[in-house]
Amino acid sequence: MTVPVLTDTHCHIDAYDNPVAVLEDAHRAGIHVIAVTEDPGKYRLLRTRLGRRDGLDVALGFHPLRAGNASPHDLARFLRLLPQATWIGEIGLDFSRAGVKTRKQQLRVFESILADPQVRTRPVTVHSRGAERETIAQLAQAQVSAILHWYTGPLAAVDDALAAGLWFSINPAMVRSTKAGPLLRRLPPERVLLETDGPFARSGSRSAVPSDLIGTLDHLARLWDISPGEARKAVAQNEQRLRYHSEHPPA
């Protein structure tokens, strides 16, 4: 029986010392990697650096902390590159202490990106730190079926996100965190996807890598009271549904 391929929906592959070795390890583990980027320039550089290879999609990103200081030229460049992107991310909002001063600029960029119809036809991975309610509201209004990456916001907003058709990606650091426990128990299994946010997220004492998602899946299997094989099949089916929703957006 074929083992379903899993997807690391949010990985900063360019931040590892040896990205190619990490990708090769992921391929052996049956993990497809979505390499998120922080701005259009980094997207073009990473595509050139890694080229076309099995098991990898480079996502077109505009991190909110970059977007807050962006020029109109940067936004125009992002929108110009959209047709060639298979995934979008990381985009979003950040109203934490690090980003609150650029709130208005971030909102302007995020709204401009979401207004482009092409965004509704791509899987999207979204940053929402300190701006969870605003991010969910913007995505719901735009009818974008996005993934909330490493969600740390109020549990009360989770139902709004689910009603908006959003997904949640879980990483190795989250399953080791007591703080994330209530979120994991609240999420319906059919809305859960996987991520590492590596190398920034940790897996024990080291940076997380895509192959660590096998352990994340084992934790979810115990939480859902099913076998690891059943959990892998369930998450793989979620990934297929995400792609279907992206390819067939609401009219």
Regions from the PLM with identified roles:
Residues 1-251:
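Mid-domain alpha/beta scaffold segments of enzyme catalytic cores
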